[in-house]
């Protein structure tokens, strides 16, 4: 689960990390009012969306007076911000954050992520932060500092101090940097975060360290013990397809293709998507119906997939162990008759009760394309999609 920049900064500020003074705004009038509250002569207006690279996409504006603030707010609110991280759909800007401009002397980068392979927290830092950090990582990988933290003992202050020295900071900033890095780790740990990124962490001309931007993601499996974090969720920033599926207990990830996928098991789902691409198609989603799939659960899956208007074909691929193919087949027929499946449908059933499942499909009289193997299922799905697209274009 992601949260907004201003929410992440509130969490950081509670732990002693310095952030610019700022305020939330939902209208141009509120934005100009916030400027008067904050004071000063320059402000930065930021679109609050769950994405990085906002500056390059026009989501961050430096303003010097009320007119510039109002104009920038008017241009941002209500439109979708498209960045390299949002995909072509973009994300709606419904709130803005106005904060005081900061006189920057140097931009740094500090990030905290889970290294799942090593089962440790990895701290990544660079003396060159800002909008070009991705290019720096690619072109100058040796300039990136990496420190791993043993979860058994947690981060030690000497590690934070080593990072501060590694960033090449002036000696009078080492103490401040050590405390800032250590406090960021505490926020990461105490709220069950999966990612915390400060980019940039700036050195100001008067010798302070300020978190100028902040991104945080959280482990959804830990939200039951973090109700204060759950309350920060903004569903308007999430893929509505994923929200619909999540509310119904389905594991769903939206993609940008045209072939909807209903599959059991993450491994089979990924293999199926690979086969669809090899056959020349593009998957519209990842949907794992899980074990014990009842007819009702299968029907819910169809509703989730068909909620994406880009879906022009559906592929159901089931390898039943815990599941039963006859139950899945009943769910497919239930979905066709109750949900209304108006796109080509390819079904491959294998494993427990597979013969019974195929018989149910055959006896139903519904237009279901049956496949025996994974490769055949992917090829038939792509062929059906192409035929449907050709018919639609005619």
From Swiss-Prot:
Q: How is the cofactor bound?
A: Binds 1 Mg(2+) ion per subunit.
Q: Per the record, what are the reactions this protein catalyses?
A: (S)-malate + ATP + CoA = (S)-malyl-CoA + ADP + phosphate
* Known pathway: One-carbon metabolism; formaldehyde assimilation via serine pathway
Does the UniProt entry include the keyword Repressor?
no
Q: Which residues bind Mg(2+)?
A: 199, 213
Q: What is its EC number?
A: 6.2.1.9
**Which GO terms fall under biological process for this protein?**
succinyl-CoA metabolic process; tricarboxylic acid cycle
- Domain named ATP-grasp: residues: 9-244
Q: Which cofactor does it need?
A: Mg(2+)
For the protein in the UniProt heading, the enzyme class is ligase
Pfam families, per the entry:
ATP-grasp_2 (PF08442), Ligase_CoA (PF00549)
GO MF annotation terms: ATP binding; magnesium ion binding; malate-CoA ligase activity; succinate-CoA ligase (ADP-forming) activity
Tree of life domain: Bacteria
* Ligand binding (ATP): 46, 99, 102, 107
Q: Per the record, GO CC terms? A: cytosol; succinate-CoA ligase complex
Q: Which UniProt keywords apply?
A: ATP-binding, Ligase, Magnesium, Metal-binding, Nucleotide-binding, Tricarboxylic acid cycle
Q: Which SUPFAM superfamilies match?
A: Glutathione synthetase ATP-binding domain-like, Succinyl-CoA synthetase domains
Q: Does the keyword ATP-binding apply?
A: yes
Which NCBIfam families does this UniProt record tie to the protein?
PRK00696.1 (NF001913), PRK14046.1 (NF010647), sucCoAbeta (TIGR01016)
Task: Describe its assembly.
Answer: Heterotetramer of two alpha and two beta subunits.
Q: Which PANTHER family match?
A: SUCCINATE--COA LIGASE [GDP-FORMING] SUBUNIT BETA, MITOCHONDRIAL, SUCCINYL-COA SYNTHETASE BETA CHAIN
Q: Which family does it belong to?
A: Belongs to the succinate/malate CoA ligase beta subunit family.
Protein name, per record: Probable malate--CoA ligase subunit beta
Organism, as annotated = Mesorhizobium japonicum (strain LMG 29417 / CECT 9101 / MAFF 303099)
Provide the gene name from the record: mtkA
């Amino acid at each position: 689960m992601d949260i907004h920049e201003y929410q992440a900064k509130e969490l950081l500020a509670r732990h002693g990390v310095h952030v610019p003074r700022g305020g939330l705004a939902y209208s141009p009038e509120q934005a100009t009012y916030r400027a008067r509250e904050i004071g000063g002569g320059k402000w930065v207006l930021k679109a609050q969306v769950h994405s990085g690279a906002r500056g390059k996409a026009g989501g961050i504006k430096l303003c010097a007076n009320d007119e510039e603030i109002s104009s920038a707010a008017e241009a941002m609110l209500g439109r979708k911000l498209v960045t390299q991280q949002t995909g072509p759909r973009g994300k709606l800007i419904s709130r803005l954050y106005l904060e005081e401009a900061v006189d920057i002397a140097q931009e740094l980068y500090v990030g905290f992520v889970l290294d799942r392979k090593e089962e440790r927290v990895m701290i990544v830092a660079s003396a060159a932060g800002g909008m070009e950090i991705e290019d720096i990582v690619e072109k100058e990988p040796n300039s990136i500092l990496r420190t791993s933290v043993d979860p058994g003992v947690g981060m030690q202050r000497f590690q934070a101090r080593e990072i501060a020295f590694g960033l090449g900071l002036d000696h009078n900033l080492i103490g401040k940097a050590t405390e800032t890095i250590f406090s960021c780790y505490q926020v990461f740990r105490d709220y069950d975060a999966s990612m915390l990124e400060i980019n940039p962490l700036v050195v100001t001309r008067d010798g302070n360290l300020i978190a100028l931007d902040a991104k945080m993601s959280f482990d959804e499996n830990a939200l039951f013990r973090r109700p204060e974090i759950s309350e920060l969720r903004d569903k308007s920033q999430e893929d509505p397809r994923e929200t619909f599926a999540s509310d119904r207990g389905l594991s769903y990830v939206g993609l940008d293709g045209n072939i909807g996928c209903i599959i059991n098991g993450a491994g089979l789902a990924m293999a199926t998507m690979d086969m669809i691409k090899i056959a020349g198609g593009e998957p519209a989603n990842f949907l794992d119906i899980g074990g014990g799939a009842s007819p009702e659960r299968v029907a819910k899956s169809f509703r989730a997939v068909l909620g994406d208007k880009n879906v022009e074909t559906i592929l159901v691929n089931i390898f039943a162990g815990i599941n039963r193919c006859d139950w899945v087949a009943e769910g497919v027929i239930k979905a066709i008759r109750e949900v209304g499946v108006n796109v080509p449908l390819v079904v491959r059933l294998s494993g427990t009760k597979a013969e019974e499942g195929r018989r149910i499909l055959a006896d139903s009289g519904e237009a279901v394309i049956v496949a025996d193997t994974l490769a055949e299922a992917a090829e038939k799905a792509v062929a059906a999609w192409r035929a449907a697209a050709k018919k639609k274009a005619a």
